[in-house]
Every structure is written in structure tokens, then in C-alpha cells.
């Protein structure tokens, strides 16, 4: 690839990322649903849960509206009961958790995160789909992935464990992004 093609390609990637971010912000601001306002659990799976608060706001306040952080010298004045499940509060905002708990406030119990006999963070085939046990819930893909399955998954027993369907606006955004990617790919 010569320099011009490489430059066009990098501009295209930046353009796609900018468009997808605009659509993502539009979805978050327009839907008003908590599950779309926060990052998905799959996104959090690659990050430490102690970094992200459990109720992250969709739109962050301006820096002028934030409360200034307290210094370490004021830590004796902070609330010492910030941790759950017997965790020890450190500097008013961090927790040292007992062995079977984790999270910013020791709110996650490893012992309760299994899905019956299926351990947490384990993939398993279920009918014609793939499912994953995540924080005590079995989440299944609605598409057929396994060999020998021709159509959509017939999962009358898994309705409660499926992830929610995307609203029409999110589906439109997805198809629009795919179209943009395909048109850029055909350009090269």
C-alpha cells in the first residue's frame, strides 16, 4: 500500500469511529433506558469492576459542576462504612474485600455468580446457540452458531435468559454503520 492509500484508509477508520460515537451518544441520550446508558457487561468484562461505579451516568456533568476531591489528609473525616460484605474501607473510597467478594464496594459475591452448575464466565452450547454464564445470568446469542442449525434459535425455554432485543433505532444505526464500512471497503 502506498502512502496515499494508507492515509485514506486511516482517515476512513477515524471517520467510522467518529460516526459510531455520534450514533452511540444519540442512542444513549434518546433512549432513556439504563441498560443502554451504561456500557454493556461485555465491555466491563475486560475491565476491573472496581474502576467503574455501578450506576455510571450516561451524560457526565461539566468539570465546573464536579465536587473537588478531598485530599488524603482529610481521609479521617470520610465515611468508614463504604464497603459491603465485611470489606475494609481505605481512604474513604477503596475497599479491601474478603476472599469471595470483589468490586469497588465488595458488592459482587463469587459464590452467587454461577448459573446453577455452570461456573461464572463459562461458554456452553444450548440448542443451536452459544450461551455464557455472566454474574449469575445465562445470556444466549439469538443467532444460530452451531453446525446443523439452519435458522434462528428456537429457544422457548430461554426467553428469560436472553439479552434484550435492540430497539429499531439501534438496528438502523447498526445497518448504517455496516453500509458505511462496506462502501469504504469497496472504495479500496
Curated annotation (Swiss-Prot):
Function text: GPI-anchored cell membrane protein involved in Nodal signaling. Cell-associated CRIPTO acts as a Nodal coreceptor in cis. Shedding of CRIPTO by TMEM8A modulates Nodal signaling by allowing soluble CRIPTO to act as a Nodal coreceptor on other cells. Could play a role in the determination of the epiblastic cells that subsequently give rise to the mesoderm.
Subunit structure: Interacts with the activin type-1 receptor ACVR1B.
Subcellular location(s) of the protein: Cell membrane; Secreted
Membrane topology type: Lipid-anchor; GPI-anchor
Residues annotated as signal peptide: 1-30
Source species taxonomy: Eukaryota, Metazoa, Chordata, Craniata, Vertebrata
Keyword Ribonucleoprotein annotated: no
Protein family membership: Belongs to the EGF-CFC (Cripto-1/FRL1/Cryptic) family.
Gene3D superfamilies cross-referenced by the UniProt entry: Laminin
Annotated glycosylation sites: 79
Broad class of where this protein is predominantly found: membrane
Tissue specificity of this protein: Preferentially expressed in gastric and colorectal carcinomas than in their normal counterparts. Expressed in breast and lung.
GO molecular function list: activin receptor binding; growth factor activity; nodal binding; signaling receptor binding
Designated name of the protein: Protein Cripto
Residues that make up the propeptide removed upon maturation: 151-188
Secreted as UniProt keyword: yes
Lipidation residue positions, type GPI-anchor amidated aspartate: 150
GO biological process terms, semicolon-separated: anterior/posterior axis specification, embryo; anterior/posterior pattern specification; blood vessel development; cell differentiation; cell migration involved in sprouting angiogenesis; cellular response to epidermal growth factor stimulus; cellular response to fibroblast growth factor stimulus; cellular response to hepatocyte growth factor stimulus
Sorted UniProt keywords: Cell membrane, Disulfide bond, EGF-like domain, Glycoprotein, GPI-anchor, Growth factor, Lipoprotein, Membrane, Secreted, Signal
Disulfide bridge map: 82-89, 83-95, 97-106, 115-133, 128-149, 131-140
Record domain EGF-like: where: 78-107
Organism: Homo sapiens (Human)
Transmembrane segments: none
Coiled coil: none
Post-translational note: The GPI-anchor is attached to the protein in the endoplasmic reticulum and serves to target the protein to the cell surface. There, it is processed by GPI processing phospholipase A2 (TMEM8A), removing an acyl-chain at the sn-2 position of GPI and releasing CRIPTO as a lysophosphatidylinositol-bearing form, which is further cleaved by phospholipase D (GPLD1) into a soluble form.
GO cellular component entries: apical plasma membrane; cell surface; extracellular region; extracellular space; membrane raft; plasma membrane; side of membrane
Amino acid at each position: 500500500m502506498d502512502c496515499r492509500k494508507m492515509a485514506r484508509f486511516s482517515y476512513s477508520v477515524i471517520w467510522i469511529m467518529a460516526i459510531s460515537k455520534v450514533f452511540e451518544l444519540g442512542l444513549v441520550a434518546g433512549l432513556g433506558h439504563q441498560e443502554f446508558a451504561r456500557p454493556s457487561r461485555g465491555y466491563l468484562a475486560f475491565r476491573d469492576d472496581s474502576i467503574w461505579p455501578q450506576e455510571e451516568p450516561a451524560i457526565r456533568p461539566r468539570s465546573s459542576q464536579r465536587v473537588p476531591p478531598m485530599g488524603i489528609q482529610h481521609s479521617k473525616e470520610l465515611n468508614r462504612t463504604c464497603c459491603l460484605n465485611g470489606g475494609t474501607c481505605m481512604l474513604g473510597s477503596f475497599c479491601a474485600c474478603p476472599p469471595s467478594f470483589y468490586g469497588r464496594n465488595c458488592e459482587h459475591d463469587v459464590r452467587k455468580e454461577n448459573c446453577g452448575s455452570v461456573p461464572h464466565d463459562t461458554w456452553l452450547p444450548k440448542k443451536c446457540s452459544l450461551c455464557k454464564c455472566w454474574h449469575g445470568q445465562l445470556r444466549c446469542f439469538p443467532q444460530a452458531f452451531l453446525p446443523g442449525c439452519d435458522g434462528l434459535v428456537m429457544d422457548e425455554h430461554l426467553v428469560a435468559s436472553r439479552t434484550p432485543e435492540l430497539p429499531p433505532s439501534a438496528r438502523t444505526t447498526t445497518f448504517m454503520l455496516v453500509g458505511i464500512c462496506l462502501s469504504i471497503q469497496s472504495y479500496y
